[in-house]
Amino acid sequence: MLNVFTLSNGRLVQVEIDQLSDLEQLQPIWVDMESPTREEKRWVKQHYGLSIPEDATGEDIEESARFYEEDNGEQHIRSDFLIDDEDESRSVRVAFILNQRNTELKSCGVLFSIRDEDIPVFRLLRMRARRVPGLIDDAKDV
């Protein structure tokens, strides 16, 4: 699922994406990919020039893989989020990619998150940012 968020009057607004051309008219601050399909990954690569590593949410999380910076200015961060289900607690890995410096790329100023399942804290952030104007000003605030 490809969730794209823009800012409108200081509030986070979700925009539905059904095809690649939908991305052309947007200036998002956050592109959240929950279990993205190959097609959705292709759209992101084609429009933003962003290559999503195949192991973005993989199990191997050596210290060097948790944070690194690409030559083009993209910062890659992998972090685990705790899910506390009724039966058990577990962690879910999320990969983040942020480019704040390279203005030559369409990805500049956009936070990309890649995850395999829904994470409650992401829902909570979206709800708060929709209701509270000015809570989020840019991709770094997400």
What spans do the regions from the language model cover?
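Peripheral, non-transmembrane regulatory/ligand-interaction domains of membrane transport proteins
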Residues: 1-142
